[in-house]
Every structure is written in C-alpha cells, then in structure tokens.
C-alpha cells in the first residue's frame, strides 16, 4: 500500500522531533545524544554537555533543585540560597502572613539568618545520578499474561529498585519512572533537604503583578521570584528543622549573568517539568478535553466565585484563601486555554491525520500488521466504553475530592494510621490540625452546597453517591438544609473537635461522624465507578504503549524525547519574539515602562496596584549595573524553550551556563503545548535576573544577599 504523502508530512510535523527548540531531554543520555548535542552547538551552546550533567563531577545540573516536588529552583550562593518563583513560594509566604504582618501584600525581607522563616512542609531535592533500568524492569514482567499482571510486576520491581538505593544510604531516595508510555524505565537517585527557610519575597505588586488577568499571557511585567535558603546539619547532610542547622554548602553554584540577551541568543532551561501528553492518541486528547479539562473549567469556576466574593470583602479571608485560590485558578485558566487552543490550532485534526499515516505504515509492514492490526479499533472502542463514566469521575474528583475541605479532612481521617509509631501519629495530627488555620467554615459550607448542585447538574443520576438519596428523603431535596445539618453535627468542623475525635480508639467511633460517614459513601461510589471501566482502562494503557512504540519504530532515525514526568529535563532554544496573529508582533522582552502603562490602563484594579514608593523607585531610572544596553530595566523575556507545569522556577541559562532568569509561565496562544509543540507560537516566559536583583537590592535593601551571589565577570 502506498503512503499518502501529505498525511505523512503532517505525521512528521506532529509527532516527531523536527524542531530544534522542541523537547524535554533526559540528562542521563545527553552525552550519547549526538543529534541534540549538535543542534545545541549550532544554536550557540559554548560549553560541553558533560559540564551540564556529570554524575561523577560537579556540573550545572547540581545547582538545580526540585522545589517542594511541585516547582523547580536553582542554587545561587555558597551558603545555599535558592531562587524560585514567587508563585512557587506563595504558599509558604501565605502561611507566615497575617493581617498584622501581611507578607503577601508588603513582601518579606530577612535581615539576618536568625530572621529567616522555617517551612516544615517544604523540601528541595537534588538529582545525583540516573540509570537506565529498562531491561531489569521488563524482565520482571516477561511472564505477565494480562495488563494488570504486567502493571503489578512492573510496579513491584520499580519499588524494589528504589528501595535498594535507600537501604545502601539512608540519606538517598531512589525512584524509578516510566518513559515512552511504559516502554522504558530509568532510576533517579536523589538527596532531599527538609530544612528550607524563607529569606526574601517581593510584595505581590511585584511577584504577582497582573494576577489572574495576566496569567498565561504575554507581554508580561511580573517579577515572579522569591528567595529561600537550604539548611543542613553540621556535616552538610540532610536534617529536619533545627536551630542548630547551618546553611548548606552546595556542590555547584550557578553563576549569574548581568549581560542579558538579544534576539537569537542561545537559552536553555533545567528543571522538573510535571507532565505532558505529546504522544497521546486523538482519542485520549478528545477524552481530556471533554473530561478533566471541562470539569476543571466548570467546577473550579463555581468554587472560585464563592471564594473570591469573600476574599474581596475580608482581609483575613484574602490571606487565608490566597494560596489555594492561586493554585486552583492557575489550572482553571490553563484548562480554558488548552481547550481553546486545541480547537483553534486544529490539534485533533493533525493527530488524526498522523494516525492515518501510522495505519498506512503498519499495513505496509507485514511484521507490524500482524502485531498491531487491531490497535486503533481497540483504542477507539476502549475510549468509547469508558467515555461517560470517565467524564463523571472527572466531575466527581473536582466536586468532592478537590472540593469542600470538610470532605478532605474526613478522607484524611479515614487514611489516618492509628497504629503507627507514636511520634509519627503526633506529627501527622499536628499537620492536620494546622490546616484549620486556613479554613472558614461558612465559606466551606457554601462551597459544599455549590459542589453538590454542580455535580448533580453535570452527570447522569446513576453516578450520584448515596448522600443524594438522603438529601431527597430526609431533606426534601434541599441541598442547603443537608449541608447546614452536616456542618452542625460533625465533630471535625473545629480543631478541638477533630483532636477529641482522633483520640478515640475504635473504627466504630470514626464512622459515627456524619462527615466521615459521607466520605465513606464517596469512596464506595468512586471505587464502583472506577471498577466499571477497569477493563477499558487496561486496554487503553496497553494500546497507548503500543502506539508509542510503533511510532518510534516508524521513525527510527528520529530523535524522540519522552513525555515529562516530574524528572529533571533539559530544554534548549533561543530568545525571540513571535507573531500571535495577523498584524501583530510581540517583542522578546518587556521593560518597567510597561508597568506604568498597565497601572494607568487598569486604574482601580487591585491586580495592577503598585505601592507608590516602588513606582517612584522605578521612575527614577537609577538602574545601575542592572540596566540594559539602552539604560532601561528589562522585566521579563521570552524564548522558545519547551516547558510545562513544574518548570516554574526553572533556571534559564545562557550559552555559558550563566543564569539569565527564571521560567515562570507559558503563553496563551500555545496553551495546547502539553499535547503538541507549536514552534511558531510556543514561548517560555521568564523573569529577568537583573530585575530580580534590582528589586532585592534597591527596594528590599537586601544588598547582603546580593553580595552572596556569584556574578559572572
């Protein structure tokens, strides 16, 4: 059978790495990846790849950390200072804030080590080495007859390999991750540091300038950075928080460039991108759009409206709910943009054309046809069989598991290990009780009632958990009356009640509480729904793995990078602007001039409110060594580096491995980037390190911190 040439060209563009700036590359095989090495040098890289990652010698990657497991960061001083985004440190800043000490609004500046603030929930993770363990993992699954048996075997050996690392050295953590839809497996060895203290945070008028309005948008003028410090024991090893700990002495300190960049300058990011679905089938993309994305859009929109109303009315609620609102709205807007971009950029049409080309290739190769003859029909049928239930599960998760905090408390209680070591029980109880500090019961009640209504409106009645029957029979269908009664009778609506409740001994007492009983009903329904589609889900898991492998065989000469999975990756490209639509061109950087323009344009909008003293400082033009060649102050810049969620706080380096800034966002026109790379549109937005240092030194009067930094000469 002859290939359809035009379709095959689309396949090449859609599913293979043909763009120099596309890809989130594994560090472990950088030296073997001659094609990537060549392209980086052609774009301007001026350092050998073994200076980027080298498990045997200090290298650039040793300065890069996973920040809390949800962001990235970079070590910039011999005393363990870490730069990350303001929105990455936002939760920590919020937890230390109060109406009297509003660090969110005013910023926080530690003048000495003694003033630096501990964050018990926070850690940083250093990557020490990676190792390909594919043969060992697949060998353990060679006798598996079903997808379930394969998964159990694979998960077991992955866990064993990881445990072997910590058994040899208790300060290390070994994690095996799957790549290429489960066709390859790599071990990553990490060392975690759990004493991480807040050192510097600019006011939100800098770190969150533009807030939701500007989120995912270019041009941008947000100084999205914060500064933390890693602490270690006296032997420079990991340690829990202690006043006796000392600043960590790093293996490698990232040098900082004050020379800036120009159009076409080489730029690379190192960080921990969360997840992408670049090789997902069109059936999976369609499910994502109509399932989890639409559920986030609908449910979070309702929940956030309840929160925002009270946040705008009360300063204490603004502080309490700032972090959770920020996290929720970030992915809410992301889902809106993703669905819009999928349609606008015709992503589904491109994927379907690519799949048609793969079908032709399979048909033209007898050995492939024998193995994969039913691949696409099986995928299509399996996705169809779980479509309705999977969509309901997405709404279920958003409405209940990520919805009212009373339910989240109850679910934690059900998972509470009362038989654990006493010290662990006390620690976990303390953490659970602390969550009440950021809860307002009247708001949570309103959220719960809204979630119950939204879920009922969006799914078939067969997906309603048992509490809806109770609402109908005992409360005449009055959801608000049910919620009022629930919150009035549950013991776990206050820290005191929860503590008293947790100190009881028997499981019988646990389920007596109406909120815990309700959560049990939710678990039962959630399990029932998942079980009903388990067979289809297994078929999809297998089908997507075979699809991925077939695609790589079809283009065996191409350089395929694996999807992001929260492991360290390198991305590279160049600094440059773009054309978002006909008649418009965006430059590759912004300056403080744009701050004044936006303040004027959005007069009265708190998203763009800036302290008069900061405006005065910026208008003075006294930028010193941080000014660009024209004497102005750059704020943000863009490159075509390939990033996603989790890359927030990633170091953006120049060709010499010197820090230019921190990645913090993507752009609205390419919000489908987790699914397909759009070379003409996709941009990584970064905050310029010179603006960061200017704010630290001139506004925050933190010259002592700037003195710690390694400025490249």
Give residue ranges: language-model regions.
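Terminal presequence/propeptide segments associated with secretion/organelle targeting
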Residues: 17-713
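Bacterial Sec-dependent N-terminal signal peptides
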Residues: 1-22
């Amino acid at each position: 059978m002859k290939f359809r040439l035009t379709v095959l060209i689309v396949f090449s563009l859609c599913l293979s790495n043909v763009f120099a700036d596309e890809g989130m590359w594994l560090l472990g095989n950088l030296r073997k990846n001659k094609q990537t090495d060549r392209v980086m040098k052609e774009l301007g890289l001026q350092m050998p790849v073994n200076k980027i990652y080298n498990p045997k010698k200090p290298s650039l990657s040793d300065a890069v950390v996973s920040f809390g497991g949800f962001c990235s960061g970079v070590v910039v001083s011999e005393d363990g200072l870490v730069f990350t985004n303001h929105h990455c440190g936002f939760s920590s800043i919020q937890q230390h804030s109060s109406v009297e000490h509003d660090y969110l609004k005013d910023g926080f500046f530690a003048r000495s080590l003694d003033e630096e603030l501990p964050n018990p929930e926070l850690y940083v993770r250093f990557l020490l080495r990676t190792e390909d363990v594919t043969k060992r993992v697949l060998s353990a699954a060679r006798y598996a007859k079903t997808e379930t048996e394969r998964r159990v075997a694979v998960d077991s050996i992955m866990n064993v390999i990881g445990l072997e690392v910590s058994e040899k050295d208790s300060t290390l953590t070994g994690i095996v991750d799957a790549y290429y839809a489960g066709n390859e497996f790599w071990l990553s060895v990490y060392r975690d540091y759990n004493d991480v203290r807040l050192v510097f945070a600019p006011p939100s008028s800098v770190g969150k300038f533009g807030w939701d309005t500007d989120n995912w948008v270019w041009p941008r003028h947000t100084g999205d950075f914060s500064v933390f410090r890693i602490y270690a024991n006296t032997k420079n090893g990991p340690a829990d928080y202690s006043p006796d700990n000392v600043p960590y002495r790093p293996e490698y300190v990232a040098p900082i460039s004050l020379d800036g960049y120009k159009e076409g300058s080489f730029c690379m990011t190192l960080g921990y991108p969360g997840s992408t679905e670049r090789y997902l089938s069109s059936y999976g993309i369609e499910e994502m759009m109509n399932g989890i994305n639409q559920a986030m859009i609908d449910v979070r929109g309702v929940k956030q409206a309840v929160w925002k109303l009270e946040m705008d009315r009360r300063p204490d609620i603004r502080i309490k709910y700032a972090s959770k609102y920020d996290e929720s709205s970030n992915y809410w807007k992301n889902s809106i943009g993703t669905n819009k971009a999928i349609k606008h950029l015709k992503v589904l049409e491109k994927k379907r054309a690519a799949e048609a080309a793969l079908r032709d290739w399979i048909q033209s190769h007898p050995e492939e046809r024998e193995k994969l003859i039913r691949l696409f029909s099986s995928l299509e049928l399996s996705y169809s069989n779980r479509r309705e239930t999977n969509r309901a599960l997405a709404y279920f998760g958003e409405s209940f598991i990520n919805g009212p905090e009373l339910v989240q408390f109850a679910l934690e209680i059900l998972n509470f290990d009362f038989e654990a070591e006493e010290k662990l029980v006390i620690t976990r109880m303390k953490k659970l009780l602390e969550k009440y500090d950021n809860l307002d019961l009247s708001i949570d009640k309103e959220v719960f009632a809204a979630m119950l209504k939204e879920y009922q409106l969006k799914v078939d009645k067969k997906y309603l958990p048992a509490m809806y029957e109770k609402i109908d029979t005992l409360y005449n269908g009055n959801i608000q009356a049910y919620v009022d009664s629930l919150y009035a009778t549950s013991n776990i609506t206050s820290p005191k009640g929860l503590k008293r409740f947790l100190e009881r001994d028997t499981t019988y007492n646990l389920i007596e509480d109406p909120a815990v009983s309700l959560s049990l009903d939710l678990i039962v329904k959630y399990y029932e729904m998942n079980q009903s589609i388990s067979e289809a889900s297994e078929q999809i898991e297998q089908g997507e793995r075979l699809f991925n492998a077939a695609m790589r065989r079809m283009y065996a000469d191409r350089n395929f990078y694996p999807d992001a999975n929260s492991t360290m990756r390198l991305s590279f490209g160049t600094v440059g602007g773009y054309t978002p639509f006909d008649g418009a061109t965006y430059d590759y950087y912004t300056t403080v001039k744009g701050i004044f323009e936006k303040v004027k344009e959005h007069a009265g909008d708190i998203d763009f409110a800036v302290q008069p003293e900061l405006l005065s400082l910026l208008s003075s033009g006294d930028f010193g060594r941080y000014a660009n060649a024209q004497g102005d102050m750059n704020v943000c810049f863009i490159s075509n580096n390939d990033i996603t969620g989790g890359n927030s706080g990633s170091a953006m380096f120049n060709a010499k491995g010197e820090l230019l800034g921190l990645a913090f966002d993507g752009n609205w026109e390419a919000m489908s980037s987790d699914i397909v790379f759009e070379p003409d549109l996709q941009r990584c937005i970064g905050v310029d390190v010179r603006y960061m240092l200017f704010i630290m030194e001139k506004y925050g009067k933190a010259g002592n911190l700037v003195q710690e930094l390694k400025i490249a000469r």
